[in-house]
């Protein structure tokens, strides 16, 4: 039986203890990360997460031992994601916040031949600090729209030289470095994270926050409208439900001519308008003085306030927009409360 070094046993024990004492365990790849950026990352994580760099085999043993001791078989699956120069990142931060923190902590790095770019690389339009030379011919050979203007190399328009996932060639690395474009990123790449018997991979954690906020707002508005339209009272919708019921009852009363303190003005106004509509089609000799006065007053109001149809439509649309905005603001104000 092969002898196992004592330091390896202690390392596995220490790693196991770290894994068991934190609710979220992530694997990150530190391969290729220079010492200084790694040190800066440790400083940024201090108080938020514990970064422990070790050998892949020892990390795997520690994960399996912790899974067995905690009776959490799903934790053992985390070992399947060990690759490169893996390290353990133990934290109480949820995996989504952890992923965001790691991504925001990455810094640009110069181009290296053979490296894979994480996102599209675009050479922006405009003058550069480069003097005319052989590099211009190399750029043009690659399709980069470069030319000499006023003794300097100028890029005629934005040009994408690499798509995300493509490899940097030696020639392109030389051009990008000469232009001062840093297409690579230095930082900790999250391989996978474990929390509550679930393994999270980067493609799951890389969410568009604004998109999800919009989805939540839309879902809230639909729920709000459904609650109001089905008269299902909640803290957020009771006022709108009562207002809708009041207006509905008032309209029914007005249509039926049922007089109450709230409807008498609308009913009388409606009756007067109907009366004047009939009166204006009758011969003048059949009208009494009071009716004539009412018709004249109505005509003067119409003449005194002429308004083009287009203006009326625009104003009506503006009023509707203002009402909609106010309604949306009022509804969205309770977004957090409705969803707990």
From Swiss-Prot:
CDD domains assigned: Ribosomal_P0_L10e
Keyword S-adenosyl-L-methionine on entry: no
GO molecular function terms noted in the UniProt entry: large ribosomal subunit rRNA binding; structural constituent of ribosome
Chain positions covered by the region annotation Disordered: 305-340
Gene Ontology BP annotations: cytoplasmic translation; ribosomal large subunit assembly
Biased composition (Acidic residues): 312-331
Entry-linked NCBIfam families: PRK04019.1-2 (NF003096), PRK04019.1-5 (NF003098)
Subunit organization: Part of the 50S ribosomal subunit. Forms part of the ribosomal stalk which helps the ribosome interact with GTP-bound translation factors. Forms a heptameric L10(L12)2(L12)2(L12)2 complex, where L10 forms an elongated spine to which the L12 dimers bind in a sequential fashion.
PANTHER family in the cross-refs: 60S ACIDIC RIBOSOMAL PROTEIN P0 (PTHR45699), LARGE RIBOSOMAL SUBUNIT PROTEIN UL10 (PTHR45699:SF3)
Name of the protein: Large ribosomal subunit protein uL10
Organism this protein belongs to: Thermococcus gammatolerans (strain DSM 15229 / JCM 11827 / EJ3)
